[in-house]
UniProtKB/Swiss-Prot annotation:
Motif (LIR): 444-447
Descriptive protein name: Autophagy-related protein 13
Region feature Disordered, mapped onto this chain: 333-361, 405-439
Residues the record lists as Phosphoserine modifications: S355, S356, S361
InterPro entries recorded: ATG13 (IPR040182), HORMA_dom_sf (IPR036570)
Post-translational modification summary for this protein: Phosphorylated by ULK1, ULK2 and mTOR. Phosphorylation status depends on nutrient-rich conditions; dephosphorylated during starvation or following treatment with rapamycin. ULK1-mediated phosphorylation of ATG13 at Ser-355 is required for efficient clearance of depolarized mitochondria.
Length: 517
């Protein structure tokens, strides 16, 4: 499609659409995990804050989404679909909903890619967060357990709505116009859940030990494209190695970014700090297993001691019980290897010997590990970020100085120098200037401070006391009922005397009136 976009705008638009597609998959799948997701706001975010949302990526979901996209982007005639289905322990399955991200030919050539498209994609992603929690599949996902699980499938191509049955409903999440077409995000969901009415799906403890997804297809088999939304237990052994976090965040390296990505940390998936072991030929990093996570899915190795360290996947997967025990082995004081028990500084973690097989130096490896990918609109300086790793579409968002937060003058301003005030000379007393006592307390004159609202007997008077006193002033004596009645009675009693005085001096009063005419 012929457009007037320059190469930079076209590159940014492709990045925005690709990253929006990946975030869309993350939002949909995380909404079907069966648990509430709570993220805390931050005034100075340090994670991947694309579209101004704290959506922490699950590496498995990102891997599946990138594999489904296969380098393509949603365009006219090519739609990205996320299918959510249900599968019971008896083997019955039913499609619940299909989310579709597509693009039509209606273009908006006047719109600006730099900010307008980005902000509208952010609003569309926020709308998706709300819509994913109002469809019937959300309530079913909250009740999944031993009886059934929720699966997801990502495919690229024509939308397949035949599995939803008759009478399904559709909802359009929103649209965003771009210079190359209009992005549309919609959902078709099943409303007939008669298949579910014959059973009671409750979270009851099993009579005997049952693997939660024993009847569910394994995550990446060649025969089935379905994947469970929830995490697998530690007893599974599929031999799957997911790409490193850095690889999963490859799409985040657009020009917007100035902050590293953050990964999912929840009750089911979490990384814990571990000691760093150093071998003679390889980098030996002990694997930390998280509760509820597949042991084989933790082939990602964790480099501790660096805040925001990136897990590194080994070159070759290790299988078998012996290999698992080797990965679980921890360093003890009796071992011959060097262990950083309390890695508190970067120097401890970088004490790694060179490989005897001619591999890359450990310094290069660590430098590769800690090159951080960054999110959007965050100008927090990070010492690991280099200018060569920043591909920013807006030059104004490039970090001015690559320095630590501790030395950032905006975070920790330097102490102001002690300079002599220009008013100090005018406050010097004449007696102290000629003396040689040198006492600093004699260099100033005591000023008698008398504010306008203060009184002589209460000095100084508090401003609050002054305000309260004049806010509720005493009542005027003339307005008092008792005093008014008393004065009226006195006037009536003295009225005859006043009339007698007037009659006596009536001629003088008449003469005065004539002078006024």
């Amino acid at each position: 499609m012929e457009t007037d976009l320059n190469s930079q705008d076209r590159k940014d638009l492709d990045k925005f659409i690709k990253f929006f597609a990946l975030k869309t998959v993350q939002v949909i799948v995380q909404a079907r995990l069966g648990e509430k997701i709570c993220t805390r706001s931050s005034s100075s975010p340090t994670g991947s804050d694309w579209f101004n949302l704290a959506i922490k990526d699950i590496p498995e979901v990102t891997h599946e989404a990138k594999k489904a996209l296969a380098g393509q982007l949603p365009a006219v005639g090519r739609s990205m679909c996320v299918e959510i289905s249900l599968k019971t322990s008896e083997g019955d399955s039913m499609e619940l909903e299909i989310w579709c991200l597509e693009m039509n030919e209606k273009c908006d050539k006047e719109i600006k890619v730099s900010y307008t498209v980005y902000n509208r994609l952010s609003l569309l992603l926020k709308s998706l967060l709300a819509i994913t929690r109002v469809t019937p599949a959300y309530r079913l996902s909250r009740k999944q357990g031993h009886e059934y699980v929720i699966l997801y499938r990502i495919y690229f191509g024509e939308v397949q709505l035949s599995g939803l049955g008759e009478g399904f409903q559709t909802v359009r999440v929103g649209t965003v116009g771009t210079p190359v077409g209009t992005i549309t995000l919609s959902c078709a969901y099943r409303i007939n859940l008669a298949f579910m009415s014959t059973r009671q799906f409750e979270r009851t403890p099993p009579i005997m030990g049952i693997i939660i997804d024993h009847f569910v297809d394994r995550p990446y088999p060649s025969s089935s494209p379905m994947h469970p939304c929830n995490y697998r237990t530690a007893g599974e052994d599929t031999g799957v190695i997911y790409p490193s976090v850095e690889d999963s965040q490859e799409v985040c390296t657009t020009s917007f970014s100035t902050s590293p990505p953050s990964q999912l940390s929840s009750s089911r998936l979490s990384y814990q700090p571990a000691a760093l072991g150093v071998g003679s030929a390889d980098l030996a990093y002990p694997v930390v297993f998280a509760a509820g996570l597949n042991a084989t899915h933790l082939h990602q190795l964790m480099v501790p001691g660096k805040e925001g360290g990136v897990p590194l996947a080994p070159n070759q997967p290790v299988h078998g019980t012996q290999a698992d025990q080797e990965r679980l082995a921890t360093c003890t004081p009796s071992d011959g290897t060097h262990c950083a028990a309390t890695p508190s500084s970067s120097e401890d973690t970088e004490t790694v010997s060179n490989s005897s097989e001619g591999r890359a130096s450990p310094h290069d490896v660590l430098e590769t590990i800690f090159v951080r990918k960054v999110g959007a609109f965050v100008n927090k300086p990070i010492n690991q970020v280099t200018l060569t790793s920043l591909d920013i579409p807006f030059a104004m968002f490039a970090p001015k100085n690559l320095e630590l937060e501790d030395t950032d003058p905006m975070v920790n301003p330097p102490d102001s120098p002690e300079t002599e005030s220009p008013l100090q000379g005018s406050l010097h007393s004449d007696g102290s200037s000629g003396g040689s006592s040198g006492n600093t307390h004699d260099d100033f004159v005591m000023i008698d401070f008398k504010p306008a609202f203060s009184k002589d007997d209460i000095l100084p008077m508090d401003l609050g006391t002054f305000y309260r006193e004049f806010q509720n002033p005493p009542q005027l004596s003339s307005l008092s009922i008792d005093i008014g009645a008393q004065s009226m009675a006195e006037d009536l009693d003295s009225l005859p005397e006043k009339l007698a005085v007037h009659e006596k001096n009536v001629r003088e009063f008449d003469a005065f009136v004539e002078t006024l005419q």
